[in-house]
């Protein structure tokens, strides 16, 4: 048993604790403020240890090459944060999480009851953390939303794997309240799309038109009615934000995209191929000191054509895997589809690459789902 498996419980607890506290004011004072940095260091070290087994995962080669390229970029390019070490730790965090998760789950018998309990507890913790941090944020709800909602929302693939459908939908309801409170258009899109996929999977795809199906449909409608009654003002604000898309260009995203594309086209061939460094879009020589709000553009600008190629390979690898899962009617097909919807929506209108805590939830899920898929294949052969 290697160190990763030996300390697996501690690593999982540290990961959940880090993500629970990351968005709260708690980490801004006292000794607690060192938790994010310590967590990044711990996962970096254990990620290197788990590399030997993690590289054999489905996306192991792609993630390995991408991680290696990110490390090179962190070394050769100046850091936007002023610390190359912190840039290195943050930019590669999701890679190490993928390797660690694969190493933990690859040789472990799946205890579904225990795993479901962890997912349920994590959902509650993330929801409480979001609401706590939301109360302390000065947010103009008519103009912007709360990004911390993505912590609970990116649990949707994990929730889709929970065996008990009633518990699944209770957790979805919890996430729905968070999404409505946050006023994030992308959050509403993720929740709506993934919830519809999950409902189709649970009650239509499997053709189970039973009392439970009808009861759940009624409960969903009652839940929607209740939300409209008690969150009428918030829902009105969300509707207004969607109406403003044409006028504000997605909070100025159209202007931002144009600026990033122009800067990339006007840069020399070396920077176009090798990039400008992690989070370089919001550098000094820009009309707006913000990131690209689109991972395709961000990766292209930060890591160049080489990094963009690796990023596209991740998308293609996931799409190919989904097709294979649906062909064999695997129970993991819809959870993996839900994970890709989260990945795609966030990549198109927001960020995952720049926020390691967000992306870590998805890469950990992909590693877990692959190990579970391999386990199901062995059972079917036997």
What residues fall within each predicted segment?
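Transmembrane signal-anchor hairpin modules in multi-pass inner-membrane enzymes, especially those
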Residues: 1-72, 110-113, 161-166, 324, ...
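Aromatic-anchored transmembrane helix interface
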Residues: 33-42, 59-74, 80-104, 123, ...
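Structural signal for the C-terminal ends of transmembrane alpha-helices
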Residues: 44-54, 101-110, 159-166, 196-207, ...
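A membrane-periplasm/extracellular boundary helix in multi-pass inner-membrane enzymes
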Residues: 181, 199-244, 264-266
